[in-house]
């Protein structure tokens, strides 16, 4: 019986290992293929059957920086993303704290806030474009930052409220009894306790803003787009420049992966808050 039990346990481990290997392959193969495409010649990319062994080249990256000036589009994305993340966290954190501990109608107000997030972006595309046109804000950082902040605030409030809810209300009551103001309670007591959750929220907002495409398409032109939108320019009447597409996709995805990797400790900490009592 002992031998049978050990064999069964070993078989299960092997099956689980095989399952996770297959799942990892499914997720990683598209990204790996994209990276390889950036280092291929255009002919190698469209050859049939596909070539897994090829002579690496930096022609795609050279085309990006010397012909298209892709670096300025990355700077556009970086400016919009960094400012948007800072503003979203700065606005959402106090609001989430208030909904969690200050007001007694936090649940009702949260539902009202989330209703704004339910509306699909394409439904407000025309009004946003008309408003930006009348205010002369097309092709500006301000327009992209404002719309990204407005779109991501409901999600950030919803997520951070759950983190603040994990802090026992007696801490706030004790601080208030000792003479602390609400702002002091928020900045000196609550924020350090939910820092992991706030940073986890910042990661999600960073990814959402960096990859945002719809409003960048509506509010910018071919003169000053963000990096994801600029990749449309590699589709010409003669075909798609796959080497440039692969190189651009690699450059666009690298900051997101690097940021998530750097913040992974806080990301896991934030997402597991309250899971252990």
Curated annotation (Swiss-Prot):
Pfam families: BPD_transp_1
Subcellular location: Cell inner membrane
Recorded topology in the membrane: Multi-pass membrane protein
Domain ABC transmembrane type-1 per the UniProt entry, residue ranges: 74-263
GO cellular component, one term: plasma membrane
GO biological process: transmembrane transport
Transmembrane annotation, as ranges: 15-35, 79-99, 109-129, 140-160, 189-209, 213-233, 242-262
Gene3D superfamilies hit by this protein: MetI-like
Chief location bin: membrane
Key words, A-Z: Cell inner membrane, Cell membrane, Membrane, Plasmid, Transmembrane, Transmembrane helix, Transport
InterPro entries in the record: BP-dep_ABC_trans_perm, MetI-like, MetI-like_sf
SUPFAM superfamilies to which the protein is assigned, alphabetical: MetI-like
Protein task: Probably part of the binding-protein-dependent transport system y4oPQRS. This system probably transports a sugar-like molecule. Probably responsible for the translocation of the substrate across the membrane.
Family: Belongs to the binding-protein-dependent transport system permease family. MalFG subfamily.
Protein name from the UniProt record: Probable ABC transporter permease protein y4oR
Provenance organism: Sinorhizobium fredii (strain NBRC 101917 / NGR234)
